[in-house]
């Protein structure tokens, strides 16, 4: 049985660091129409921030080089107060998704990244799905049901 949705939105943004804020603002404004608690909205904001940052930094490798690199974000709100947020890039892809989802796993040798992105997303969402193909990109989908 298919769930009835209340609203849906798609965003396409250049994959640059300042658009992480834009994504959070737009998505949270839409989610706010479901009247979530402050904690629930904070959870969504934090998980989305991690997903977008991962796409920019790891998917494309540069938080400042725009050159045709785009983020695709889709949000669906359902009548049962659940939501789905997908963040997709056409970047490098993840060679080993299971390893990438382990706490503290990082491919960053500069020490700038903690390897906690997926752990944070999983802590704040009911479910996180990751689909990726090396050389083609990654799609991270966040699921949450509000109280």
Features from the language model and the residues they span:
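Conserved beta-strand-loop-beta-strand hairpin that lines the nucleotide-binding pocket
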Residues: 1-10, 55-147
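A generic structural signal for short
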Residues: 15-16, 40, 106
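Conserved short strand/loop->alpha-helix "switch" segment adjacent to the catalytic nucleotide/phosphoryl-transfer site
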Residues: 24-50
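STAS-typified acidic loop motif
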Residues: 10-22
């Amino acid at each position: 049985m298919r769930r009835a949705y209340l609203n849906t939105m798609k965003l396409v943004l250049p994959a640059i660091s300042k658009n992480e804020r834009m994504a959070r603002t737009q998505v949270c404004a839409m989610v706010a129409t479901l009247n979530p608690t402050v904690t629930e909205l904070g959870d969504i904001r934090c998980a989305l921030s991690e997903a977008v940052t991962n796409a920019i930094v790891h998917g494309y490798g540069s938080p400042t080089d725009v050159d045709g690199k785009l983020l695709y974000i889709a949000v669906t709100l359902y009548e049962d107060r659940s939501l789905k947020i997908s963040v997709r890039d056409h970047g490098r892809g993840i060679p080993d998704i299971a390893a990438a989802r382990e706490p503290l796993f990082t491919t960053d040798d500069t020490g700038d990244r903690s390897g906690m992105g997926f752990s944070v997303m999983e802590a704040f969402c009911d479910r996180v799905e990751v689909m990726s193909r090396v050389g083609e990109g990654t799609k991270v989908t966040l699921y949450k049901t509000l109280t």
